[in-house]
């Protein structure tokens, strides 16, 4: 059952104030002295201090807690290339999630650029303003070029969430699915449908977790990716088979894991029936999965099924990752978000699923209980414990791999401080939002 109607969604974005975000002050501006401190002449003292020591920009401005969510609107959710104007509601929504879950401030920037080079050049000029860059909804292969170039040429974290967020959360789900079904990850066979940003990143990340590259068969809109196909995009060669191994139905036979990042109703019940014992399906087409939860379970009651939807078990949602990963990347002043940090996030999230679930989380999802098993392989996105689970693990990985410019010695204390920080943020925001109602 739908949680809302189309008109309710439009009204939510329209009223009582247009959009979902607003810039608010953190300092008073009510007296002559306030005004003089906020701007001229008092602001000059902060400017001079930063001019003498650039690192002080993190102390005297909000840069260290400010992330740019940047898109060109070429690959938006399940909507495709709708352009930068139509992409803006998504980018504002991303800002809401950053702030709500991890108290990270966001400016959303939808760019109207004519080329990959223009996009890269525009983002590079923003480094003095932001502590991190979240790339969003950019089509492949441009997204790979953009991220790789910006990571090399900027001194702040650059993270394409459509790639790595999906990979990290589904990677956590994969770790637990292997454990629950008695599989060794190095033996898992995988069929990936969707060779865009998310599909490629997931396949790469699964390899980092232990899946053998030769065990992955990848499909795009034209079928199996293999080296005898003509006009194959260069980036797809990474997972190309030597020969044409047949159709999706052929390749699904006996496979352990299906990963779908494509379109609805692509997978039949017969395909699911042909999979290995205790098959795992991550059907994440948006908004409707490649096969419904009901159809998959009817075909194979022994399957583990995950989707991107909140109304089915095992929701694989990027919001369980990116706010917290950026939170600690900012706090340790990381120069990048590297592979070790991503793996640490996935492992921490997987471990949390095995812990008893608080009543408040069960209540949020209208269930009596949640227990580690086939229908609960990954924590629910609204679980507040994710904050204190992921952030210390990722911070430690950043420090251990030498990308942190600032050390956090007491990680347990850091986790407790984050709890207080996010609660205080919620306490400030709640009456502010209510003032518009």
State what each model feature region is.
Residues 28, 32, 39, 43, ...:
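Generic structural signal for well-ordered, non-membrane alpha-helical segments
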């Amino acid at each position: 059952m739908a949680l809302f109607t189309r008109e309710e969604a439009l009204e939510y974005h329209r009223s009582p104030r247009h959009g979902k975000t607003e810039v608010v002050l953190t300092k008073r501006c009510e007296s002559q002295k306030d005004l003089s401190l906020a701007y001229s002449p008092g602001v000059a003292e902060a400017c001079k201090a930063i001019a003498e020591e650039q690192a002080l920009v993190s102390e005297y401005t909000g840069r260290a807690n400010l992330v740019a969510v940047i898109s060109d609107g070429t690959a938006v959710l399940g909507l495709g290339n709708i352009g930068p104007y139509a992409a803006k509601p998504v980018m504002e929504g991303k800002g809401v999630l950053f702030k709500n879950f991890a108290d990270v401030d966001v400016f959303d920037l939808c760019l109207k650029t004519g080329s990959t080079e223009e996009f890269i050049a525009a983002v590079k000029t923003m480094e003095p303003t932001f502590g991190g860059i979240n790339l969003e909804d950019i089509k492949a292969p441009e997204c790979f070029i953009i991220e790789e170039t910006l990571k090399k040429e900027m001194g702040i974290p650059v993270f394409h969430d459509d790639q790595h967020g999906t990979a990290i959360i589904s990677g956590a789900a994969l770790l637990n699915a292997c454990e629950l079904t008695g599989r060794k990850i190095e033996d898992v066979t995988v069929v990936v449908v969707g060779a865009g940003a998310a599909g490629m990143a997931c396949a790469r990340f699964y390899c980092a977790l232990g899946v053998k590259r030769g065990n992955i068969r990848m499909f795009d809109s034209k079928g199996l990716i293999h080296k005898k196909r003509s006009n194959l995009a260069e980036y797809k060669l990474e997972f190309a088979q030597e020969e044409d191994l047949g159709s999706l139905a052929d390749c699904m036979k006996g496979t352990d894991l299906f990963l779908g990042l494509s379109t609805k109703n692509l997978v039949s019940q017969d395909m699911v029936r042909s999979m290995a014992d205790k098959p795992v399906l991550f059907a994440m087409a948006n908004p409707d999965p490649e096969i419904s939860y009901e159809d998959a379970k009817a075909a194979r009651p022994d399957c583990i099924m995950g989707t991107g939807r909140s109304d089915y078990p095992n929701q694989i949602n990027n919001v369980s990752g990116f706010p917290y990963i950026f939170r600690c990347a900012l706090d340790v002043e990381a120069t990048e978000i590297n592979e070790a940090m991503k793996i640490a996030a996935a492992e921490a999230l997987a471990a949390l699923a095995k812990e008893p679930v608080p009543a408040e989380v069960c209540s949020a999802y209208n269930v009596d209980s949640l227990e580690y098993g086939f229908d609960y392989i990954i924590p629910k996105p609204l679980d507040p414990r994710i904050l204190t689970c992921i952030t210390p693990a990722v911070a430690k990985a950043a420090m251990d791999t030498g990308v942190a410019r600032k050390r956090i010695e007491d990680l347990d204390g850091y986790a407790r401080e984050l709890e207080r920080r996010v609660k205080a943020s919620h306490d400030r925001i709640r009456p502010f939002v209510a003032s518009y109602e």
